[in-house]
């Protein structure tokens, strides 16, 4: 949908700055669902992981990095059948940590302090969206 989004944006005279957000919001990350599905359905096949990656480029600013994180976290959160505080926290951490592992933010002027703050905000937002109550320890 990245390429079609760029085409649609250009057709509608959207500024290049906005198109850059469309272009970078998946970076060069792997489309895990299709990759895992392929491995499951064709276990004997030799697979080139590059065939299951978005073309990029990777985010180049804090803002494009935040969009990438938000898009991935939001999409992943829809897969949770019964969101809990723990599952939402784990989802935010694992999603963003995977992006860091894949070096999606190496061209951004973003710090680990920034990323930690962003994670906290996303966790709070998801708790609110899914109406999850804070789990207090039992006395």
Model features per residue range: what roles?
Residues 2-7, 13-139:
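Terminal helices and disordered tails flanking the catalytic cores of nucleotide-processing hydrolases
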């Amino acid at each position: 949908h990245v390429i079609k989004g760029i085409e649609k944006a250009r057709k509608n005279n959207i500024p290049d700055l906005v198109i850059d957000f469309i272009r970078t919001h998946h970076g060069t990350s792997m489309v895990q669902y299709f990759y895992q599905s392929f491995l499951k359905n064709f276990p004997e096949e030799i697979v080139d992981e590059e065939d299951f990656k978005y073309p990029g480029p990777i985010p180049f600013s804090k803002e494009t990095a935040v969009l990438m994180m938000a898009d991935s976290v939001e999409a992943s959160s829809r897969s949770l059948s019964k969101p809990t505080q723990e599952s939402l926290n784990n989802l935010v951490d694992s999603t963003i940590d995977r992006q860091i592992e894949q070096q999606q933010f190496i061209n951004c002027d973003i710090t680990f302090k920034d990323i930690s703050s962003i994670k906290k905000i996303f966790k709070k937002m998801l708790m609110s969206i899914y109406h999850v109550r804070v789990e207090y320890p039992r006395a």
